[in-house]
Amino acid sequence: MAEKRTLIAVIADEDTTTGLLLAGIGQITPETQEKNFFVYQEGKTTKEEITDKFNHFTEERDDIAILLINQHIAENIRARVDSFTNAFPAILEIPSKDHPYDPEKDSVLKRVRKLFGE
């Protein structure tokens, strides 16, 4: 199952997405013409759109190995992010230009702390 998961997907603001695309993670699947990124626009993107893309990348696509999501965007769908327990894709919360990273909010670090009894 993991051998066909080769892509990194992104749910992020425009600057973060642009930087990652320039670094080479952009991919459009030939069969379906689906992108592996979603650009969040402050004040325009709805919580439902974020949830739909998160579900699409985590449940419907079988070629995604890692999902990068800006932490401030993950906060909009925190319950959904925290409830995701599958091994693939790995969910990594990343900072953005305007929103610094807060380890107290990171769902992966919360699980690690819980595992070690902290």
From Swiss-Prot:
Q: Which GO terms describe its molecular function?
A: proton-transporting ATPase activity, rotational mechanism
Return the GO cellular component terms, semicolon-separated.
fungal-type vacuole membrane; Golgi membrane; membrane; proton-transporting V-type ATPase complex; vacuolar proton-transporting V-type ATPase complex; vacuolar proton-transporting V-type ATPase, V1 domain
Origin: domain of life: Eukaryota
Q: List the disulfide bonds.
A: none
Q: How does it assemble?
A: V-ATPase is a heteromultimeric enzyme composed of a peripheral catalytic V1 complex (components A to H) attached to an integral membrane V0 proton pore complex (components: a, c, c', c'', d, e, f and VOA1).
> What InterPro entries is this protein classified in?
ATPase_V1-cplx_f_g_su, ATPase_V1-cplx_fsu_euk, ATPase_V1_fsu_sf
**Species the sequence originates in:** Saccharomyces cerevisiae (strain ATCC 204508 / S288c) (Baker's yeast)
Cite the entry's keywords alphabetically. Answer: Hydrogen ion transport, Ion transport, Membrane, Transport, Vacuole
Q: Where is this chain's protein located in or outside the cell?
A: Vacuole membrane
Q: Which GO terms describe its biological process?
A: endosomal lumen acidification; Golgi lumen acidification; proton transmembrane transport; vacuolar acidification
In the bilayer, the protein is annotated as:
Peripheral membrane protein
* Range of residues in the leader sequence: none
Mind telling me what this protein is named? V-type proton ATPase subunit F
Q: Could you share any additional remarks the record makes about this protein?
A: Present with 4050 molecules/cell in log phase SD medium.
What is the name of the gene encoding this protein? VMA7
What functional role does this protein have? Subunit of the V1 complex of vacuolar(H+)-ATPase (V-ATPase), a multisubunit enzyme composed of a peripheral complex (V1) that hydrolyzes ATP and a membrane integral complex (V0) that translocates protons. V-ATPase is responsible for acidifying and maintaining the pH of intracellular compartments.
Write one Pfam family the protein is assigned to. ATP-synt_F
Family of this protein: Belongs to the V-ATPase F subunit family.
Is Membrane given among the entry's keywords? yes
